[in-house]
C-alpha cells in the first residue's frame, strides 16, 4: 500500500517540502485546491523527486476538459509517467457562487467530463479525428498546430473524488480510481462504496480491481494522552465542517447521525463556527478516523485499509521541509503501513 502526503500550495519552501517527503519514504505527493492553484505544486514535485504526484483534487467543472487534458499531457510527459490526474466536483454553492459556473447533476456530468478528457488524449496519441459530443461538452476541432508533442509514456490515470454511491459507480465505470472522501468510514467503504464501484465496473465489463480506492481520511496521533486529545479535537473541528454540509448527509445517515447534520448545518448558517466542533462526539471521531499512538495508527491503517485500498494519505509531519525533529519516527511509521 502506497503512503502519500499533502503538498501545500506553491511557495518558496515547496522544493524543501518535496525533498523532505521523499527522504521520509513517502511514495506520492498530493496537491489539493483550497486557497491555491493545484497544478503548479505538481510540477515542482515532479521536477524535484521521483515520487508519484497527483492533483487531489482539482475542481473539474470550472475548467474545460481541453484545458485539463493539455495540462495532464504536459505534466505526464515532463514527469516520465509519474503524474496522476485527480478530479472533483465541489458542491453546488461553490460552483455557482465562487466559480460562477452552472450546476447540474454532478455524477453524470463527471462521467462525461472524464470521457471528454480521454477522447482528447486518444486523438493526440493516435491521430484519430476528435469527435466528442456530449450533453455538457463538445470537442470536435483539433489541428496539428494545437496537437502537443508525442508522449513516450502511458496516459495519466484519472481519479475522481466521491462520497456517495453515484460517484463511486462512475469511478468504477470510467475512472482509474476513486479518491475517498474523508467522511467515508471503513464500514461505509465496505458496505456502500465497494458494491457501487463493482456495479459501475460491471457496466463497462471490467474488473472492479481496475478502479483503485485511495483513502485520505482523518488521523489523530499522540505519544502522550495530552497530545492525542489535542489531535482528536483538531479532527473534531474538521469533521464539524464537513458534517455541516447537506451534500455529505448520506455518510452521516449511514451511522445514524442525521440529527447532528441538521444541527451543524444550522450553526454554519448562523456563522457559529466555534460552537460547531463541540457537537462532534468521540464516537464520530473514532468511527470516521484512526486514533492512537503513531504505531497503533500505522498498524490499524495497514490492517483495516490494506486489503481494500491502494494508498493512504498520512500527513504526520505538520511542517514538512522545516521540522525534522520526528524524521526517524515518521519514517518508521511509513514503513509499517507499507
Can you describe what each PLM-predicted range is?
Residues 1-338:
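Active-site-adjacent structural elements that line small-molecule/cofactor binding pockets in enzymes
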Amino acid at each position: 500500500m502506497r503512503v502519500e502526503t499533502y503538498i501545500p500550495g506553491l511557495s518558496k519552501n515547496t522544493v524543501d517540502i518535496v525533498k523532505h517527503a521523499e527522504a521520509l519514504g513517502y511514495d506520492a505527493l498530493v496537491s489539493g485546491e483550497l486557497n491555491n492553484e493545484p497544478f503548479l505544486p505538481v510540477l515542482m514535485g515532479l521536477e524535484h523527486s521521483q515520487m508519484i504526484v497527483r492533483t487531489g483534487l482539482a475542481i473539474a467543472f470550472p475548467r474545460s476538459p481541453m484545458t485539463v487534458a493539455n495540462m495532464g499531457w504536459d505534466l505526464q510527459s515532463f514527469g516520465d509517467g509519474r503524474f496522476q490526474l485527480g478530479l472533483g466536483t465541489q458542491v453546488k454553492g461553490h460552483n455557482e457562487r465562487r466559480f460562477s459556473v452552472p450546476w447540474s447533476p454532478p455524477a453524470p456530468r463527471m462521467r462525461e467530463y472524464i470521457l471528454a478528457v480521454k477522447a482528447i488524449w486518444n486523438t493526440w496519441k493516435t491521430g484519430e479525428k476528435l469527435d466528442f459530443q456530449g450533453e455538457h461538452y463538445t470537442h470536435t476541432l483539433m489541428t496539428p498546430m494545437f496537437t502537443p508533442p508525442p508522449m513516450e509514456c502511458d496516459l495519466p490515470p484519472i481519479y475522481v473524488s466521491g462520497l456517495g454511491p453515484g460517484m463511486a459507480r462512475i469511478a468504477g465505470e470510467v475512472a482509474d480510481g476513486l479518491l475517498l472522501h474523508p467522511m467515508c468510514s471503513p464500514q461505509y467503504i465496505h458496505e456502500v462504496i465497494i458494491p457501487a464501484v463493482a456495479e459501475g465496473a460491471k457496466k463497462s465489463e471490467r474488473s472492479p480491481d481496475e478502479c483503485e480506492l485511495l483513502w485520505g481520511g482523518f488521523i489523530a496521533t499522540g505519544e502522550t494522552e495530552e497530545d492525542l486529545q489535542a489531535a482528536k479535537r483538531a479532527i473534531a473541528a474538521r469533521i464539524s465542517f464537513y458534517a455541516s454540509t447537506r451534500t455529505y448527509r448520506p455518510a452521516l445517515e449511514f451511522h445514524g447521525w442525521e440529527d447532528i447534520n441538521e444541527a451543524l448545518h444550522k450553526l454554519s448558517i448562523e456563522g457559529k463556527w466555534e460552537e460547531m466542533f463541540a457537537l462532534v462526539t468521540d464516537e464520530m471521531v473514532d468511527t470516521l478516523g484512526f486514533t492512537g499512538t503513531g504505531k497503533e495508527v500505522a498498524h490499524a491503517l495497514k490492517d483495516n485499509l490494506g486489503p481494500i485500498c491502494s494508498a493512504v494519505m498520512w500527513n504526520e509531519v505538520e511542517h514538512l521541509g522545516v521540522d525534522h525533529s520526528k524524521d526517524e519516527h515518521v519514517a518508521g511509521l511509513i514503513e509499517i503501513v507499507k
